[in-house]
Amino acid sequence: MDRLIMGKYDVSGIQIHDMGLAKYINLNSYFNLHTGGRYSNYSAGKRNVNTIERLLNKLMRTEKWTGKKYSAYRVLKEAFEIVEQKTKQNPVQVLINAIENSAPREEVTRLKYGGIAVPKSVDVSPSRRLDEALRNICIGATSKSFKSKVPIEECLANEIILASRNDGNSYAVSKKEEIERVAASAR
């Protein structure tokens, strides 16, 4: 039986190179990417939700897209078609590469020592790394399409492609580098 996402993209040959994220990237094949918060009451329930659906949910964060899952689904479907045309690769593999390249490995937290806040570098959990990567990919796409004639489908496709190439022009990759640079200075 083929493992297809959106009824079109095969996920059986997808390779995840980052072993820390491999346990948290879920590519169960669903034709309809809508679990309806089924896993929200379970600890670490996010692990059971398909990564593509989590990307859809991150797209619905702004006031323009709130509650419009079908519109977000249409945008993602068209973005995947653009990615497939431009790269001649499976867009799910390109997305996984983008997630691996834009997931920060360490960040800064604030510790208080006698009333003084001191920044301290800490490792990031794999679940948070995945959330940060998906969020930054979506923020980069929506910010580039805001007050622009370029449709969000193209912006999302370009953001995914740039992040998969580890290009500094990608919002997600530049944000990751910024977070890691601040963490390196706080060691």
From Swiss-Prot:
A GO term, aspect molecular function = structural constituent of ribosome
- Extract the SUPFAM superfamilies matched here: Ribosomal protein S7
Matching Pfam families, A to Z?
Answer: Ribosomal_S7 (PF00177)
Which Gene3D superfamilies does UniProt cross-reference here? Ribosomal protein S7 domain
BP GO terms, sorted: translation
Q: Which UniProt keywords apply?
A: Ribonucleoprotein, Ribosomal protein, RNA-binding, rRNA-binding
Query: InterPro entries this protein is in?
Result: Ribosomal_uS7, Ribosomal_uS7_arc, Ribosomal_uS7_CS, Ribosomal_uS7_dom, Ribosomal_uS7_dom_sf, Ribosomal_uS7_euk/arc
Q: Name one GO cellular component term.
A: small ribosomal subunit
The record's subunit annotation is: Part of the 30S ribosomal subunit.
Q: Identify the HAMAP family for this entry.
A: Ribosomal_uS7_A
* Recorded family membership: Belongs to the universal ribosomal protein uS7 family.
Function (record text):
One of the primary rRNA binding proteins, it binds directly to 16S rRNA where it nucleates assembly of the head domain of the 30S subunit. Is located at the subunit interface close to the decoding center.
Descriptive protein name? Small ribosomal subunit protein uS7
Organism the protein comes from: Picrophilus torridus (strain ATCC 700027 / DSM 9790 / JCM 10055 / NBRC 100828 / KAW 2/3)
What gene does this protein come from? rps7
